[in-house]
């Protein structure tokens, strides 16, 4: 692993976290004490710098943040990539070190501190506050979906009080509602756009785009809680669609960094290769997006793309890098965080549940999700793909000299929509295609597997520390909480509703 624990903690604790680190996102050279208070207020420089910091946590592309928050968790557990270092302890095998468990939560204090500074400098009455609410919601949705209960006002202290996952979701919904109301009621959006464009790494100051993103987060949330809060979910989803979600690829939430986090961890460092699960589905479906997603391995065989089974006992990272395909990204490839394709699939599921998603049918939104994905990746052949009612996932054949072994296919679901299929078949077909289209957003891929059980994934090829799950339901809390925050930790486990381990389910899984 390419991150030092000491350096990582230093990175988190340095006061310069709100200044020098932001220089990696935009060309801002903040000379610290040389700036007067008046100069800090000029062009909203002070509040803008904290909003940049918030974006760095909400959409982590810096290599250490990306690896510890995204790669080690969602990308591996969502079966997009798999860890190919020799380390025999990781989340896939249900036995990661405490450092791996603690890392995602360690990014909460910086975004909370930055949010509080935005409020101090700006107040709570305009689109700047709305933007901060949206960024915090994006980050905390990930935190709670990794751990379950989580401190909402985390400041890195020893007295952090945990909130239940349900309460966190309710707070995030309220925050997003407040944010969209503030944006809609603002009469100076053109002026605000010009002011904040230098600090907006996603939409260049276009707050109408942030409004669509906030509504899209609400639709994502609604689908996630649909099994445990069906009435609330329907109301939230219908409101989000009515108010306007992301529907065009030009509105997709993407962010550019000076070096793509996925490129750094997978290509430059070589810590991962593509997972056998997504390769087997896409190979079986003859999916033309494969060449956009993956690269051919150095040691090629009968297949152009070869994945490695999740949890494979890696004997040599050097050999694994040669045998298996890596991701097809460059240093400048933008990170992808929410797309029109995902929203179309959410609408498709909503209609399947009886929600009003704007008048379309499940079939229409399902096909729109696939079309949007093909267009997003600039791939031809979508008409042929949509009509394929015979292709299924293929059996996985490991490469000669590989580490995971062969595995028979675990799904027979086809691509073409069938209104006469059973509800289970419809859900499997819909979520399997959604999972393929969500790539490379591993956190959302993992969320879908946990929430629905789809797509079906391969068993792990080695012992999993006594667990019978195919992928964890959550990540355990930092064990240091048992020492330094014991009373609140005990309460957090009560809120969790089960042991502090990999098996206890999320609130929205029950």
Model-derived regions, located:
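Bacterial Sec-dependent N-terminal signal peptides
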Residues: 1-30
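Bimodal feature
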Residues: 1-3, 20, 45, 185-186, ...
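Terminal processing/anchoring signals of secreted or surface-associated proteins
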Residues: 12, 21-24, 54, 137, ...
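Membrane-proximal, proline-rich intrinsically disordered regions
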Residues: 21-78, 465-510
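Extracellular glycan-recognition regions
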Residues: 24-26, 101, 455
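Beta-strand acidic-aromatic groove motif in beta-rich domains, primarily in extracellular
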Residues: 63-72, 149-150, 233-234, 442-447
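Structured, solvent-exposed acidic/aromatic patches
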Residues: 79-381, 419-428, 433
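C-terminal functional modules
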Residues: 376-510
């Amino acid at each position: 692993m390419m991150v030092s624990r000491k350096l990582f903690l230093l990175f988190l604790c340095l006061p310069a976290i709100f200044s020098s680190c932001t220089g990696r996102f935009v060309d801002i050279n903040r000379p610290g004490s040389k700036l007067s208070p008046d100069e800090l207020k000029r062009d909203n420089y002070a509040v803008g710098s904290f909003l940049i910091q918030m974006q760095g946590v909400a959409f982590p592309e810096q290599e250490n943040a990306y690896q510890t928050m995204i790669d080690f968790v969602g990308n591996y557990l969502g079966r997009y990539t798999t860890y190919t270092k020799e380390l025999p302890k990781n989340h896939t095998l249900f036995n990661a070190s405490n450092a791996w468990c603690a890392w995602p939560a360690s990014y909460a204090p910086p975004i909370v501190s930055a949010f509080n500074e935005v409020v101090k400098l700006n107040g709570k009455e305009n689109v700047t506050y709305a933007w901060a609410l949206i960024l915090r919601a994006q980050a905390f949705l990930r935190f709670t979906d990794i751990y379950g209960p989580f401190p909402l006002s985390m400041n890195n202290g020893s007295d952090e009080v945990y909130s239940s996952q349900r309460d966190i979701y309710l707070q995030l919904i309220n925050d997003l509602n407040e944010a969209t109301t503030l944006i809609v009621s603002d009469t100076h959006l053109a002026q605000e756009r010009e002011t904040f464009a230098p600090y907006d790494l996603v939409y260049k100051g276009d707050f109408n785009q942030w409004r669509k993103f906030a509504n899209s987060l609400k639709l994502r949330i609604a689908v996630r809680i649909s099994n445990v809060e069906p009435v609330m979910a329907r109301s939230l989803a219908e409101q989000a669609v009515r108010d306007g979600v992301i529907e065009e690829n030009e509105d997709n939430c993407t962010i550019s960094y000076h070096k793509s986090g996925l490129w750094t961890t997978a290509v430059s460092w070589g810590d991962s290769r593509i997972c056998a699960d997504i390769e087997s589905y896409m190979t079986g479906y003859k999916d033309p997006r494969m060449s956009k997603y993956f690269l051919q391995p150095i040691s090629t065989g009968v297949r152009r793309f070869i994945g490695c089974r999740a949890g494979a006992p890696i004997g040599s990272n050097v050999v694994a890098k040669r045998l298996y395909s890596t991701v097809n990204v460059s240093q400048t490839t933008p990170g992808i965080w929410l797309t029109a394709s995902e929203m179309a699939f959410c609408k498709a599921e909503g209609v399947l549940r009886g929600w009003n998603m704007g008048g379309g049918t499940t079939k229409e939104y399902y096909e729109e999700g696939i079309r949007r994905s093909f267009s997003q990746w600039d791939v031809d052949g979508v008409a042929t793909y949509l009509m394929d009612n015979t292709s299924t996932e293929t059996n996985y054949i490991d490469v000669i000299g590989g580490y995971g072994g062969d595995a028979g296919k675990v799904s027979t679901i086809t691509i073409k929509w069938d209104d006469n299929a059973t509800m289970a078949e419809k859900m499997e077909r819909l979520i399997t295609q959604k999972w393929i289209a969500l790539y490379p957003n591993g956190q959302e891929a993992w969320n879908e597997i946990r929430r629905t059980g789809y797509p079906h994934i391969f068993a792990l090829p080695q012992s999993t520390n006594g667990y019978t799950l195919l992928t964890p339901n959550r990540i355990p809390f930092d064990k240091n909480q048992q020492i330094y925050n014991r009373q609140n930790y005990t309460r957090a486990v009560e809120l969790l509703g089960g042991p502090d381990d990999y098996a206890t389910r999320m609130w929205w899984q029950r």
